[in-house]
Every structure is written in C-alpha cells, then in structure tokens.
Amino acid sequence: MGPSRLVRGPRPQGMRSPYRRPGMGWPRPRFPRMFKCSRRRYQQGLRGRTASSAAINPATRAMGINNTHTDTTIVWIFPPQVLRHLRQPGIFLIL
C-alpha cells in the first residue's frame, strides 16, 4: 500500500466514480425529453445574381463581398402528450 492511499482514504459511498457523467446533475430536469429544438443554418445562395450584373452594379458588387448572411431555421418537435395539452380550449398557440 503506497502513501497516497493512506493519506486520501476511501471515497464516500455516493461518489462511485471519479468523473461526472453528463446529465446526472441535480436537480434532475422535470421533463427530460419533452421539448426538443433543432437549429439548422442554411447558406443563402447567389441565385438571382449573375457575374455580369454584379460587375455592372457597384452596390451589388459591394454587397457580394461581405455577403455571409445565413438564415436560421428553428424546428420544434413536440411529443403527442404536449400536443394534446396544447389543443385544450382556451390555449392559443402562436406559430
């Protein structure tokens, strides 16, 4: 038995593992997978513009230099029990 074992002593019974597992924190979430949110980013393509029109119009040419705008689409996925709750009379769902 080495000296480090004598100094530290045994771990408490509640901590079985030296590392923390994700999702094991306290307090536990009330509805673990009730609401899911998916974010996807779509790159805006240069569909409407051609190279010749961008070369002619200086405003279009200047906009094309730094055109890194991406549209973010957020998709919410609800389980059936949440949808049943949202269909109750008197509840307004704004989409």
UniProtKB/Swiss-Prot annotation:
Highest taxon listed in the record's lineage: Eukaryota
Any GO BP annotation: cytokine-mediated signaling pathway
Segments for region (Disordered): 1-27
UniProt-recorded name of the protein: PIK3R3 upstream open reading frame protein
Organism: Homo sapiens (Human)
